[in-house]
């Protein structure tokens, strides 16, 4: 199956299937156009895939080898340099085409700027958006661009999608006021717990799009990300939430975004790769 806006790149090393036969389909979005602090998100998809080469495909605590699952990797989106809206349009069109060919598949974006999650949500049309992020991303505009990475949750809210945001430790009063007006619940990293997650997500309508901005994790784990923040969550806290979510809710799509860096062995990419394997494993073992 060919796509207008994708190109071949490094792929997972274990056997892959054609997109039409896959349950999970990877798509890289190497976009870095509105990064406001540390550049390098354009290398994210490749760094995550490289990091998977260091991991065993067998997940011990699941007794599951994800190399035996029907996974496809359709490469990376050919981005429009400096234009988050046009690049997100390419993400949207690619996923719309993909869903026509295989409506039961779960697309997984690897990125890449968080701005590109908008294109995925527009294509997959979830009822709810659950995001782990250090930032609220509810600005109306940032650096004169309404499609900046700092605005993605606001643009998604304007689509009528219900939202819940976890791991926050940075935001503006404007964003907090907007969240209050739109009844968007969020949980500060200091107050995060599994019970707090379940309490807010349990009532959300399905299907759910799950987004992980890698900066939600503690900075010691993820030093290479576009807008790093101290004081984040632990790896197993997020995995526990994912396990519950995929068992209780239908998943429309999933992403791991804002992975930056420039070299093999970067701890940020290694964290993202491990999270990718656990997320796929959880969806296979516990998901519907």
UniProtKB/Swiss-Prot annotation:
UniProt cross-references to PROSITE patterns, sorted A to Z: ARGINASE_2
Cofactor, how bound (note): Binds 2 manganese ions per subunit.
Q: Where is this site: Important for catalytic activity?
A: 144
Describe activity versus temperature. Answer: Optimum temperature is 90 degrees Celsius.
For this UniProt record, give its keywords in alphabetical order, as a comma-separated list.
Cytoplasm, Hydrolase, Manganese, Metal-binding, Polyamine biosynthesis, Spermidine biosynthesis
What residue range is the signal peptide?
A: none
Q: Which InterPro entries match?
A: Agmatinase-rel, Ureohydrolase, Ureohydrolase_dom_sf
Q: Where in the cell is it found?
A: Cytoplasm
Q: Where does Mn(2+) 1 bind?
A: 114, 133, 137, 213
According to its UniProt entry, what is the function of this protein? Involved in the biosynthesis of polyamines which are thought to support the growth of thermophilic microorganisms under high-temperature conditions. It seems that long-chain and branched-chain of polyamines effectively stabilize DNA and RNA, respectively. Catalyzes the decarboxylation of N1-(3-aminopropyl)agmatine to yield spermidine and urea. It can also use agmatine to yield putrescine.
Q: What else is known?
A: In T.kodakarensis, two kinds of synthetic pathways from agmatine to spermidine are predicted. One is the pathway via putrescine (pathway I), and the other is that via N1-aminopropylagmatine (pathway II).
Tell whether Iron is among the UniProt keywords: no
**Which SUPFAM superfamilies does the entry link to?**
Arginase/deacetylase (SSF52768)
Enzyme Commission no:
3.5.3.24, 3.5.3.11
Top-rank taxon: Archaea
Q: Which PANTHER family match?
A: ARGINASE/AGMATINASE, GUANIDINO ACID HYDROLASE, MITOCHONDRIAL
Q: Which GO terms describe its molecular function?
A: agmatinase activity; aminopropylagmatine ureohydrolase activity; hydrolase activity, acting on carbon-nitrogen (but not peptide) bonds, in linear amidines; metal ion binding
Q: What happens when the gene is disrupted?
A: Cells lacking this gene show to a decreased growth rate at 85 degrees Celsius and a severe growth defect at 93 degrees Celsius. This mutant accumulates N1-aminopropylagmatine and agmatine at 85 degrees Celsius.
* Full protein name: N(1)-aminopropylagmatine ureohydrolase
Organism, by scientific name, is: Thermococcus kodakarensis (strain ATCC BAA-918 / JCM 12380 / KOD1)
**Cellular component annotations (GO), alphabetically ordered:** cytoplasm
Regarding protein family, the annotation reads:
Belongs to the arginase family.
Reaction(s) catalysed by this chain, per the record, are: N(1)-(3-aminopropyl)agmatine + H2O = urea + spermidine; agmatine + H2O = urea + putrescine
Q: Could you say which enzyme class this protein belongs to?
A: hydrolase
């Amino acid at each position: 199956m060919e796509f207008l806006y994708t190109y071949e790149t490094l792929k997972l090393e274990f056997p892959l299937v054609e997109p039409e036969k896959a349950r999970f389909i990877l798509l890289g979005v190497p976009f870095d156009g509105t990064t406001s602090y540390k550049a390098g998100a354009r290398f994210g998809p490749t760094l995550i895939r490289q990091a998977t080469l260091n991991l065993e495909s067998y997940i011990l605590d699941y007794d599951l080898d994800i190399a035996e699952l029907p996974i496809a990797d359709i490469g990376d989106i050919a981005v429009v340099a400096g234009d988050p809206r046009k690049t997100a349009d390419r993400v949207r069109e690619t996923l719309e085409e993909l869903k026509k060919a295989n409506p039961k598949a779960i697309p997984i974006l690897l990125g890449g700027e968080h701005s590109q999650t908008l294109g995925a949500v527009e294509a997959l049309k979830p009822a709810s958006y659950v995001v782990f992020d250090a930032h609220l991303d509810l600005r109306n505009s940032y650096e004169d661009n309404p499609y900046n990475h700092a605005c993605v949750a606001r643009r998604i809210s304007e689509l009528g999608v219900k939202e819940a945001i976890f791991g926050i430790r940075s935001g503006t009063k404007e964003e907090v006021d907007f969240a209050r007006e739109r009844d968007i619940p969020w949980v500060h990293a200091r107050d995060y717990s599994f019970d707090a997650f379940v309490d807010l997500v349990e009532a959300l309508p399905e299907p759910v799009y799950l987004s992980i901005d890698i900066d939600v994790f503690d900075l010691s784990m993820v030093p290479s990300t576009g807008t790093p923040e101290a004081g984040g969550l632990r790896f197993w806290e997020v995995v526990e939430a994912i396990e519950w979510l995929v068992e209780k809710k239908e998943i429309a799509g999933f992403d791991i975004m804002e992975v930056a860096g420039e070299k093999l062995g970067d701890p940020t990419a290694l964290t993202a790769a491990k999270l990718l394997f656990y997320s796929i494993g959880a969806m296979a073992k516990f998901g519907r």
